[in-house]
Amino acid sequence: MSGKPELAGQTVVVIGGSSGIGLETARLARGEGAQVILTARDSDRLHRVGRELSAVIAAFDATDFERLGRFFDELPAPIDHVLVTGPGPYYAPLAKFDVEQARRNVEAHLLLPLQVARDAARKVRPGGTLLFMGGTEGRRTAAGLAFISA
C-alpha cells in the first residue's frame, strides 16, 4: 500500500448530503481525500456541512427534475461517484392514507434514482459508481407499511 487515501483526487457527489447516511458518507469521502459535492433541500444545514467539509454545495429539491438536470449539466466532468439517499418512507394506515404524500414518496424513492442515473450518466467516468440507498421496509410487515412494502 502506498498510504495514499483511497479516494484522493476523485470527485464524489452526494444527493441528500446534509444529514444521515449522506452526510456520514460525505465525511468519510472527504477524509479519504475526495472532492465532495453535496446537494440537499435544507439550505442552512447544507451551508454548515459545506463549511465543515470544504465541500461544493447546491441547495435544491432533487425531485425538481429540471433543476436536477441543470445541476448535473453544470458539474465539471468527470465525476467518479454519485450517491443518492432519500427522505424517510411514508407510513400511514389505509384509513389515514394521504395519496399526495404517497405520490411525492414514490417520486423521491423510485423516480429520483432513475432521473439521477439518466442525468449523471453523461458526467460519471467509465468505471465510476452510481449508488442508490434503499431501505428494508419492503421485507417487513406491520400496520401502516402496505404502501412502502409494495
Roles of regions detected by a PLM:
Residues 32-46:
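Conserved glycine-rich Rossmann-like NAD(P)H-binding loop of the short-chain dehydrogenase/reductase
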Residues 52-66:
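Rossmann-fold cofactor-recognition segment
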Residues 77, 108-128:
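Amphipathic alpha-helical dimer-interface segment in Rossmann-like NAD(P)H-dependent oxidoreductases
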Residues 83-92:
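Conserved NAD(P)H cofactor-binding loop of Rossmann-fold oxidoreductase domains
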Residues 95-114:
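Catalytic Tyr-X3-Lys loop
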Residues 105-106, 115, 129-150:
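Catalytic loop of short-chain dehydrogenase/reductase
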